[in-house]
Curated annotation (Swiss-Prot):
Positions annotated as glycosylated: N40, N74, N160, N179, N246, N317, N346
Transmembrane segments: none
PTM field: In natural infection, inactive HA is matured into HA1 and HA2 outside the cell by one or more trypsin-like, arginine-specific endoprotease secreted by the bronchial epithelial cells. One identified protease that may be involved in this process is secreted in lungs by club cells.
Organism field: Influenza B virus (strain B/Victoria/103/1989)
Membrane association type: Single-pass type I membrane protein
Stated family: Belongs to the influenza viruses hemagglutinin family.
UniProt name for this protein: Hemagglutinin
GO BP term, example: symbiont entry into host cell
Gene3D superfamilies: 3.90.209.20, Hemagglutinin Chain A, Domain 2
Reported function: Binds to sialic acid-containing receptors on the cell surface, bringing about the attachment of the virus particle to the cell. Plays a major role in the determination of host range restriction and virulence. Class I viral fusion protein. Responsible for penetration of the virus into the cell cytoplasm by mediating the fusion of the membrane of the endocytosed virus particle with the endosomal membrane. Low pH in endosomes induce an irreversible conformational change in HA2, releasing the fusion hydrophobic peptide. Several trimers are required to form a competent fusion pore.
Gene name in the database record: HA
Length: 360
């Protein structure tokens, strides 16, 4: 910043009197003011920055969650959310979470009709909680549920640590043992088993196949009806019979059937209900979740730390109070988006050098 020179010269004589006023060097700084429009000033401080794209980072001063289960190798977040065998582990607590799976999220183990329900939203629902844990006990006794006794079905595409066959830990595939006959709708109550103050996320579903397989497994080859109800939300489904091409998941045997998977959220102390016919996937282990975690769309890995996480620019450190560029969701200690750059005038209004005035 160039110095402002104030010079006042008064010369008194019988001759002419010459006066000069405030002068300064030429100023390149122009600011827009509310009352005078564009004004030249002697100095400014920039208040805005235009970020460049960078990698995402851990948010300073808080825990940031990338994958739901960092130690569950070769598992999608949906695998973890459904508790697929070999994809069960600890989900770290976090105040901020990264939505990092940009393509349609799928799960292995058994062919799922993902588009029939909101099941792809389950990982995002879990990300929105600070603390998430899978219950150690099953919410109901599936083998003795109404319409049973049942044996619990497994799949060769779901190997667990002790067997070549397994299934999702959140659900039990209820196959009638001896009473393979059609049934009227049956009702099972789903109790609340989480700790006080936790939301309970209960996963359930149903299996359907071609007519021959439905008759063999359940004794009924007709479409089956299913309903879930919890927290004032009721959902109805009717199973599709046949019409599925064979599909193989993760090197297992080709499957002619499909499963439809959904979930319901039970608030503290509230009981849920499931009304079902043949082919039901009864709930088993449930998610218990509490607190809130801010979620932002991003990418992995998380490298270093940043003041702010921005959906378009990644990790940002706050060097200025405002920023220009793309406006998008951001979390943390973030600059404020403005349309045009802002400057703080820290000098005075520029005045051109005063002209010499001659008085007689």
């Amino acid at each position: 910043m160039k110095a402002i020179i104030v010079l006042l010269m008064v010369v008194t004589s019988n001759a002419d009197r010459i006066c000069t006023g405030i002068t300064s060097s030429n100023s390149p700084h122009v600011v827009k003011t509310a009352t005078q429009g564009e004004v030249n000033v002697t100095g400014v401080i920039p208040l805005t920055t235009t970020p460049t794209k960078s990698h995402f980072a851990n948010l300073k001063g808080t825990k940031t969650r990338g994958k739901l289960c960092p130690n569950c190798l070769n598992c999608t977040d949906l695998d973890v959310a459904l508790a697929r065998p070999m994809c069960v582990g600890t989900i770290p607590s976090a105040k901020a979470s990264i939505l990092h799976e940009v393509r349609p999220v799928t799960s292995g183990c058994f062919p799922i009709m993902h588009d029939r329900t909101k099941i792809r939203q389950l990982p995002n629902l879990l990300r929105g909680y600070e603390n998430i844990r899978l219950s150690t006990h099953n919410v109901i006794n599936a083998e003795g549920a109404p319409g049973g006794p049942y044996r619990l079905g497994t799949s060769g595409s779901c190997p667990n640590v002790t067997s070549r066959n397994g299934f999702f830990a959140t659900m039990a595939w209820a196959v009638p043992r001896d009473n393979k006959t059609a049934t009227n709708p049956l009702t099972v109550e789903v109790p609340y088993i989480c700790a006080k103050g936790e939301d309970q996320i209960t996963v359930w579903g149903f299996h359907s196949d071609n007519k021959a397989q439905m008759k063999n497994l359940y004794g009924d080859s007709n479409p089956q009806k299913f309903t879930s109800s919890a927290n004032g939300v009721t959902t109805h489904y009717v199973s599709q019979i046949g019409g599925f091409p064979n599909q193989t998941e993760d090197g297992g045997l080709p499957q002619s059937g499909r499963i439809v998977v959904d979930y319901m959220v039970q608030k503290p102390g509230k009981t849920g209900t499931i009304v079902y016919q043949r082919g039901v996937l009864l709930p088993q282990k449930v998610w218990c979740a509490s607190g809130r975690s801010k979620v932002i769309k991003g990418s992995l890995p998380l490298i270093g730390e940043a003041d702010c996480l921005h959906a378009k620019y990644g990790g940002l450190n706050k060097s200025k109070p405002y920023y220009t560029g793309e406006h998008a969701k951001a979390i943390g200690n973030c600059p404020i988006w403005v349309k045009t750059p802002l400057k703080l005038a820290n000098g005075t209004k520029y005045r051109p050098p005063a002209k010499l005035l001659k008085e007689r």
